[in-house]
Amino acid sequence: MVEFVNPKSLGELEENVVAINRVTKVVKGGRRLRFAALVVVGDKQGHVGFGTGKAQEVPEAIRKAIEDAKRKLITVPTVSTTIPHDVLGEWGGGKILVKPAEEGSGVAAGGAARSVMELAGIADVTAKSLGSATPINVIRATFDALTSLKDAEEVAKLRGVSLEHLAE
């Protein structure tokens, strides 16, 4: 079970609109247009969330998506500027492989996964999207990967090494 973070306990949250889709519903009288927004929010200090929103107008869809994202904030365990270990996340047809990277190498991730990593405050990471390239599937797979991460102390204990040797 994932524990969500209260957004009021955090500082300023940054938002990034990942995708806006125009959705059409065909009814007897013609077509009904709506907009669906996909947004990622984070504080760049280990907390990140994503949300979706639908509305008749784009700004309203974005506002709903931001509210949804703030309700689904998670904490991401980090070691210095990267993640503690390799992890594979899956959601639907989308898979993502996330690996820690050397300090100073930056975020090597494409599209939707990049915004999740940056807003989570992970500065050095490599991510490869496998399978579905749909932004929502990539983001959900990324969140699956990030929620299955173990914290650095737990990884060091499992491997039988000290915390200092883990970062090497």
Swiss-Prot record:
Claim: rRNA-binding is one of the keywords in the record: yes
Query: Could you give a GO molecular-function term held by this entry?
Result: structural constituent of ribosome
InterPro entries documented for this protein: Ribosomal_Su5_D2-typ_SF, Ribosomal_uS5, Ribosomal_uS5_bac-type, Ribosomal_uS5_C, Ribosomal_uS5_N, Ribosomal_uS5_N_CS, Ribsml_uS5_D2-typ_fold_subgr
Q: Name one GO biological process term.
A: translation
Q: Which GO terms describe its cellular component?
A: small ribosomal subunit
What role does this protein play? Answer: With S4 and S12 plays an important role in translational accuracy.
Q: What is known of its domains?
A: The N-terminal domain interacts with the head of the 30S subunit; the C-terminal domain interacts with the body and contacts protein S4. The interaction surface between S4 and S5 is involved in control of translational fidelity.
- Protein name stated in the entry: Small ribosomal subunit protein uS5
Gene behind this chain?
A: rpsE
